[in-house]
Curated annotation (Swiss-Prot):
Assigned keywords, A-Z: Cytoplasm, Methyltransferase, Mitochondrion, Transferase, Transit peptide
GO cellular component terms, semicolon-separated: cytoplasm; mitochondrial matrix; protein-containing complex
Protein name: Electron transfer flavoprotein beta subunit lysine methyltransferase
EC assignment: 2.1.1.-
GO BP annotations listed: methylation; negative regulation of fatty acid beta-oxidation using acyl-CoA dehydrogenase
Pfam families: PrmA
Superkingdom of source: Eukaryota
Subcellular location: Cytoplasm; Mitochondrion matrix
SUPFAM superfamilies: S-adenosyl-L-methionine-dependent methyltransferases (SSF53335)
Spans traversing the lipid bilayer: none
Function: Protein-lysine methyltransferase that selectively trimethylates the flavoprotein ETFB in mitochondria. Thereby, may negatively regulate the function of ETFB in electron transfer from Acyl-CoA dehydrogenases to the main respiratory chain.
An example Gene Ontology molecular-function term: heat shock protein binding
Length: 255
């Protein structure tokens, strides 16, 4: 994503724009919303572009914010919904999705929780690779609508989507938890670490993490419990969109 944009405006006006420059900051947890709002659906379809290029997963079509979209250039305060983090295909999610598509045995026949699902690409990759049950989780109800639209783009029936903060709750058993680009804030990283450890110890849940090497991740104590499974060179457009980050990796969590 280029940042010589009119839409960028003063960065103080929209934390989303800071996200793109700093690598995805903390955003507020939100309450459950409807994924069936027709007005919202029409607005997202009008203001996003269907694309499968410029990422590690050309097999997956997604509705994203691109330079051909009005709000790439428009004033940020004119966007009527919560900050559209879901409208960017972040590099950690790209690596996770690529890994699942290339290694379908990891998810085939398994139950999967996609934590911080965003555009839903990793959940979609899991479904394409044969996962039996999927729950996509994101704190933003607008992401829920985006995930629903992206499922349909890829010929999939929408899977369950939970739009709330689940880090303070005890979740049911999943065979696999996947999360990408979630270690962007130190406090959140600590909460994630504890929550993921509890899932592993309580249920033996496998955890895969995608990250391009942000400082909050590479400098966190969780590194002592990770094993790298794969590393991918990011496509040039993704490198440009992420301040020159060149690779993204997938890690297996073993506390």
């Amino acid at each position: 994503m280029a940042f010589s944009l009119c839409w960028k405006a003063p960065r103080s006006q929209w934390s989303f724009l800071q996200a793109l420059n700093s690598g995805f900051p903390l955003f507020p947890w939100r309450t459950v919303g409807s994924c069936l709002d027709l007005k919202m659906k029409a607005y997202l379809e009008e203001n996003t572009e269907v694309t499968s290029s410029g990422s590690l997963t050309p097999e997956i079509q997604l509705r994203l914010l691109t330079p051909r979209c009005k709000f790439w250039w428009e004033r940020a305060d004119l966007w009527p919904y919560s900050d559209p983090y879901w409208a960017i295909y972040w590099p950690g999610g790209q690596a996770l999705s690529r890994y699942l598509l290339d290694n379908p045995d990891v998810v085939r026949g398994k139950s999967v929780l996609d934590l911080g699902s965003g555009c839903g690409a990793t959940a979609i990759a899991a479904k394409m690779s044969g996962a039996s049950n999927i729950l996509a989780n994101d704190v933003d109800p607008i992401a829920g609508m985006a995930i629903t639209l992206n499922c349909k783009l890829n010929g999939l029936n929408p899977f369950p989507i939970l739009t709330k903060n689940i880090l303070n709750t005890r979740q049911g058993k999943f065979d696999l938890i996947v999360l990408g680009d979630m270690f962007y804030d130190e406090d959140l990283a600590d909460s994630l670490h504890l929550w993921l450890q509890n899932c592993f110890w309580a249920y033996g849940t496998r955890v895969l993490i995608g990250d391009p090497g942000r400082p909050q991740f590479s400098g966190h104590s969780i590194q002592h419990q990770l094993y790298q499974l794969a590393e991918y060179t990011l496509p040039e457009p993704t490198q440009q969109d992420n301040n020159g980050l060149t690779t993204s990796a997938v890690w297996d969590f073993h506390p």
